[in-house]
Amino acid sequence: MGKYVLGIDQGTTGTKAIVFDRKANIVSSAYSEFTQYFPQPGWVEHDPQEIYDVSMRVVKEALDKGGIDPNDIDSIGITNQRETTVFWDRRTGRPVCPAIVWQDIRTAGRCDELIAKDGKGIVERTGMIIVTNCAAPKIEWVLKNLPEVKAEVDAGNVIFGTVDSWMV
């Protein structure tokens, strides 16, 4: 059984890695920010590869600071930045387009259309309210606006999810 638990807080502006001992004491930690992109008003994007690289760097730094052998990590917990949406090649694990951040409001018009058409019904069927920070309208936006990504999704080569599912 490992001696430590690693927590990764992959947040909206940076990533923190914290190593805890078996008594929940913090042994070591590391943090680093990554780049925010604002290509248009209301749009917020991240480079998923940069998120991954920063995350791996802070994990290594936290382990090094604590003098911890990676084999002594018993489990890893990941928390992430809400509904930020990543599309990646299932064969390589590489992202195929920028991540659309949960704060991004490019899907506001589409969300308004869905609410007007069947907002109450959607909530009743799914338990989810229709808002721009959810992944579903972001996924639809990518599939409608990035034909090269849609073609790869249709071919079964590209999959999508939130940051935590991609990092795992």
Where are these regions (language model features)?
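N-terminal glycine/serine-rich phosphate-binding loop of ATP-dependent small-molecule kinases
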Residues: 1-97, 124, 144, 151
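General structural feature for long, well-ordered alpha-helical segments within catalytic domains
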Residues: 16, 51-55, 107-110, 138, ...
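Glycine-rich phosphate-binding loop and adjoining helix at the ATP-binding site
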Residues: 86-145
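Gly/Ser/Thr-rich active-site cleft segment
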Residues: 2, 10-12, 23, 122-168
